[in-house]
Amino acid sequence: CSIGCAVNSYDMENAVRNAVKKGIPVVVSSGNEGRGDVNGAIREISYPAAYDDSISVGAMDRNFNIASFSNSNEFVDFIAPGVQMLTAYPNNQYALVEGTSFAAPLISGSLILLKQKFINDFKRVPNETELYGLLMKFTRELQDINKQMQGHGYIDFSINRKKRR
């Protein structure tokens, strides 16, 4: 389920905070109100992405360009592919879609992989802060792109990780 609104909701913020307190990372899309400002000077705010306790994910394309629709602000934590994403569509069809709602699940999946590896290696469940730190170990920043556009960058699990662009 995708959710995003321009107005803060105490109930939604409380739900996010409570989930994180219980060890459940809350990964959300940053929002699709971006205006294509590559310098990140324009701030587009969406909730729950603007909550400190949520992990906000913006979108990039396959060429490592920030998607023009992806929100930019100080709350963006990571970016992931969110342009020309192949997905199931009604009536047994497939479609190419775009949006930060398609980028966020890639970060969620990355967290699941890291959590399982942590459990296998250390024989205990990591807390949300440890998971976030593990995720950060596998990020790569896009050069010459404002931090408000990409947060810590994109996830790279490849063996020979190299800086892009």
Where are these regions (language model features)?
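Substrate-binding/access-modulating region of protease and related hydrolase catalytic domains
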Residues: 1-53, 63, 72, 90-104, ...
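Secreted peptidase-domain scaffold signal
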Residues: 4, 31, 159-165
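Subtilisin-like serine protease catalytic core
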Residues: 20, 51-54, 63-64, 71-75, ...
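Hydrolase catalytic cores
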Residues: 24, 82-150, 154, 160-162
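Carbohydrate-associated surface elements
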Residues: 60
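Substrate-binding/active-site groove segments that recognize
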Residues: 76-77, 155
